[in-house]
From Swiss-Prot:
One GO CC annotation: acetate CoA-transferase complex
Main localization of the protein described in the UniProt heading: cytoplasm
Enzyme class at the top of the EC tree: transferase
Protein name: Acetyl-coenzyme A carboxylase carboxyl transferase subunit beta
The encoding gene: accD
């Protein structure tokens, strides 16, 4: 036996390090590898480049509303395949797949609660559910949110993240544009504030209806906001679009939105604006709140 073989025989093999899944993630913008817990503390905003990653509807609402005050509305509403629609896959199968993947029944989650002790109703889109597309259930839940705000005489906040109307529901989906817009007219008649927060992306029938009808339209940084996508527009007009076209920074220069607010500052900004609109005392800054993985719970109707 050679001296090299004698040394090798005395070396014990090391155990392969096991790293649990989900501990690290990668920023889609700068490519930086990030510690998942740090990213959650920063509300899914990259601490290196300030890129605002997509956030689940429940985590967004839980990071906005005061703890222990949240009650879900419209959770009993579920989508139905009334048209027996089928493209490359049956619509009912797409619904089942999206429900299994996200744990949600449809693409909009509505809750009532308090924001800095101020009663509010808040809605948020779950983009992972069929691209946050708007169907009959999304419209019905949004109207439920409006009705609850009217009943409680309180403001309504909606966080949009949608690709637009859900093609599998055809005309029933397009009807929601008119229904939701008409419902907001009742908020205006009562003088109750409706704040629309546009997140990445807010497109199609959602941007063409209630997402742009806020008394105040706020956007997150670099959010894609528009009706048709940039690629479709370029192919139609056969011209190169200007840099940053349809991004929130471009839109605020053109007067299409009112302000851009970073996600970690959103809770206090919304509370401050609503306090002014409702003639209430200005809220005090609170401790930074992190995004948490919300466990599955039986929601209250």
């Amino acid at each position: 036996m050679s001296w090299i073989e004698r040394i090798k025989s005395n070396i014990a093999p090391t155990r392969k390090a096991s790293i649990p899944e989900g501990v690290w993630t990668k920023c889609d913008s700068c490519g930086q590898v990030l510690y998942r817990a740090e990213l959650e503390r920063n509300l899914e905003v990259c601490p290196k480049c300030d890129h605002h990653m997509r956030m689940s509807a429940r985590n967004r609402l839980h990071s906005l509303l005061d703890e222990g005050t949240m009650v879900e509305l419209g959770s009993e509403l579920e989508p139905k395949d009334l048209l027996k629609f089928r493209d490359s896959k049956k619509y009912k199968d797409r619904i089942a797949s999206a429900q299994k993947e996200t744990g949600e029944k449809d693409a909009l989650v509505v809750m009532k609660g308090t924001l800095h002790e101020m009663p509010v109703v808040a809605a948020a889109f779950e983009f992972s559910f069929m691209g946050g597309s708007m169907g009959s259930v999304v419209g019905a839940r949004f109207i439920r949110a409006v009705e609850q705000a009217l009943e409680d005489n309180c403001p309504l906040i909606c966080f949009s993240a949608s690709g637009g109307a859900r093609m599998q529901e055809a005309l029933m989906s397009l009807m929601q544009m008119a229904k939701t817009s008409a419902a907001l007219g009742k908020m205006q008649e009562r003088g109750l504030p409706y704040i629309s927060v546009l997140t990445d992306p807010t497109m199609g029938g959602v941007s063409a209806s209630f997402a742009m009808l806020g008394d105040l339209n706020i956007a997150e940084p670099k959010a894609l906001i528009g009706f048709a996508g940039p690629r479709v527009i370029e192919q139609t007009v056969r011209e190169k679009l200007p840099p940053g076209f349809q991004r929130s920074e471009f839109l605020i220069q053109k007067g299409a939105i009112d302000m851009i607010v970073r996600r970690p500052e959103m809770r206090l900004k919304l509370a401050s604006v609503l306090a002014k609109l409702m003639n209430l005392p200005a809220p005090s800054p609170d401790e930074p709140r992190e995004s948490v993985v919300v466990p599955d719970q039986e929601p209250e109707a």
